[in-house]
Regions:
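Terminal leader/tail segments of proteins
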Residues: 1-161
């Protein structure tokens, strides 16, 4: 693994902390599914963790919850706690477990309680006007933009980092 050095206006995921940091942002965050706006906010939080592109958590009040139904299963993050999954449904189009939230996160992450994160591999996600690229693999939900460099955890062979 060779770290990519950030250029002007970029940040490296290898400079992000562990345990992760929560950071409020005023950038415009949008999520679409089936050509429908699901969420839009300028009050989202980024969670920054070593080796991962940022994961964005959108306030529930900035999300059109009428398009969300309870998803299947749950997972546990060593830092944030138990994640609840959400399925996005617009008309007859469905994205299973396309989003998640931490309804009752650990103390360090209370800022993101009841906020929603979405997988850019299952929804169209934007930071400002840039369409996000999904973090490799299908477990982590990081958002890759041109201002973040890796390499990123998630691809085959990176799980042991």
């Amino acid at each position: 693994m060779k770290r990519i050095e950030p250029g002007p206006g970029q940040e490296s995921v290898w400079d992000y902390p562990r345990p992760p940091r929560v950071e409020l942002s005023s950038r415009r965050i949008r999520v679409f599914f089936a050509d429908t706006l699901i969420a839009e906010s300028t009050k989202a939080y980024r969670v920054l963790e070593t080796s991962h592109p940022p994961t964005w958590y959108i306030p529930r009040e900035d999300t059109k919850t009428e398009f969300l139904i309870s998803g299947k299963g749950s997972s546990h993050c060593e830092w944030k706690g138990v994640a609840t999954y959400w399925t996005v449904k617009v008309g007859d189009q469905v994205a299973e477990n396309a989003g998640w939230s931490y309804e009752h996160p650990s103390t360090r992450f209370t800022a993101i309680a009841r906020h929603l994160a979405f997988y850019p591999s299952r929804c169209e996600c934007y930071v400002d006007e840039e369409r996000v690229q999904p973090q490799p693999g299908d477990f982590y939900g990081g958002w890759i933009t041109s201002d973040v460099v890796g390499p990123f955890k998630g691809s085959p062979g990176t799980w042991g980092w």
